[in-house]
UniProtKB/Swiss-Prot annotation:
CDD domains xrefs: 5TM_YidC_Alb3, EcYidC-like_peri
Membrane topology summary: Multi-pass membrane protein
Protein's name in the database: Membrane protein insertase YidC
Function field: Required for the insertion and/or proper folding and/or complex formation of integral membrane proteins into the membrane. Involved in integration of membrane proteins that insert both dependently and independently of the Sec translocase complex, as well as at least some lipoproteins. Aids folding of multispanning membrane proteins.
Region of interest (Disordered), ranges: 612-633
Species classification: Bacteria, Pseudomonadati, Bacteroidota, Bacteroidia, Bacteroidales
Example GO molecular function: membrane insertase activity
Transmembrane segments: 3-23, 377-397, 453-473, 499-519, 541-561, 562-582
Pfam family, one: YidC_periplas
GO biological process, one term: protein transport
Cell compartments where the protein resides: Cell inner membrane
Matching InterPro entries: Membr_insert_YidC, Membr_insert_YidC_N, YidC/ALB3/OXA1/COX18, YidC/Oxa/ALB_C, YidC_ALB_C, YidC_periplasmic_sf
Known partners and oligomeric status: Interacts with the Sec translocase complex via SecD. Specifically interacts with transmembrane segments of nascent integral membrane proteins during membrane integration.
Domain of life (superkingdom): Bacteria
Amino acid sequence: MDKNTLIGFLLIGVVLFAFSWFNRPTPEQLEAQRRYQDSIAKIEYAQQLELQKQENKSALVEDSLENLPDSVRAQRLQQSFGVFGDAMVGTEDYTTLQNDVVELRISNKGGRICYARLKEYDTYNDEPLVLFDEKESNFNFTLVTATNRVVNTSDLYFTPVKGNDPNSVIMRLNTGEGSHLDFTYTLKPDDYMVQYQILGTGLNGVLAPSTNALDLLWEQDIRQQEKGRKFEDRYVTLNYKFMADDVEHLSESKSDSKQIPNRLKWIGYKDMFFSTVLISQEGFEATTLDSKAIPEGDVLKQFKTTASVPFDLQGKEATNLSFYFGPNKFALLKSFDKGVSAEQQLDLEKLVPLGWGIFRWVNQYFVIPLFDFLGKFIHNYGILILLMTIIVKIILFPLTYKSYMSSAKMRVLRPQVEEINAKYPGQDKAMERQKATMELYSRAGASPMSGCLPMLLQMPILIALFMFFPSAIELRHQSFLWAHDLSTYDAIFSWNKYIPIITPYFGNHISLFCLLMTITNIFYTKYNMEMTNTGQQQMPGMKAMMYMMPLMFLVFFNQYASGLTYYYFISTLITIVQTLIFRYTINEDKLLAKLEANKRKPMKKSGFMKRLEEAQRAQQETLRKQQEAKKKR
């Protein structure tokens, strides 16, 4: 890594810090948010107390009725839960709804989807890829009866009703003669989207007259599906979309919770490559989202949502929801918005973490189309990444060439810079030395900063690719050379023993592509520092920092996707080849002659150069005064 690259990274860091600093909330906003959270917490606490009372009451009823005769039990349940008493007793059974890509199991207890498997995918150890099962999920609506009893649908037994449509099933909760609550699930062929409709019939005297919404509780554990637990956990997030607005998410790195006062279009429980999304046409209101990080075990995070969904007590209109159980594949998620107005678009493709701002734009309109186009003809993704790297290098060639020419100019002027250093030795003549060097560069038509701008312009593509490769589900379970899966690390050596500091940050393995990337970066750094030595004095520690960066990348990327480290390895190799070609094809004698000719031409100073020289003169005067003050002492 050369000095220009390091400066580019530092500039990006400064921009990110400045953006965060100027967009931080004001004290007034923080105080308003605190008051809002306090009020929500009080309401939530009261609701939890009431819910706990109802749960305790239900548990006591079940315990006291367990040994009673069926007739007596039915009578007692009728007294405690009214028309819902009969639905409190039953035997759990399951109805399967499936197509070629998804298998779902719907339990008659709660009338909910309790199992979801993606047929076209497996886990990292070749087991069926199950998003969740009955023990890892909960989906419940709280019902308030006309007699002010609180009943949970998760405690009630529904009756499956099969209609004429083989792709649909109705889970019916009977509440009396001509009165029932229907949950209808419809799964079309080859579709990951499940239509979910809630419709009540004759519930006017069953539910409370004020009922115009149902309170939802949705919980799910996110399983580990990939080989690298720590790396996968970085991409496990609870996402949500505002109505006709942007997509946001809770913290990826720690437990998090948030109350959302605005209506939400959808809520998504996202793993690294797969998601479970609940969508509402009318929107979710009074939503509370909770994400709990699990440090060890097969579960990465536990997600929880409480929200309110509209419900028509008169039964004239159904509540229309949808589930998405499927992969985080950009083209697939984008297809759900085809032919849909901008206000109604789901924006599910934003579940794929492609970066923000210009980086996402580069991925969406350049990287992904190029990747998909090459994928139509090349099925070996190692070869595809190689060709993609070459294409990117060709596109960036003009910027790379300009950067190298700037370095070449600095290099051929090095003897003259060394003469200036000899003429103005010591720290006390630093300003004279700097001024003379800048005058030399200005007269010759060279600029130390001209090599930084091309490198900075390349950064959006380089960072976009850094975001793209770990998120590309196409690389999942795709092998190349010794790497069995390009979506995770390619360990050539591993161990089981926990080693303090090393295991948490480096892992219990060594990734070969990451190691090769580090070696090539160290070689390129050494070679490039020799080639770009301008004779000027470097900042203290700069050389050590240049060598430390590749070693830091070894630690940082060791647990990353091998597809990404393979790309960086190939990219650095191509850069080395380009540098060698530039080195031996550019005639430095002719270049020096051209620069000497520039020095003889009258040059009009730019406004920037004038301001730079004025600043240098001011610094020189300040330094002179400081030195005189020291002599007087």
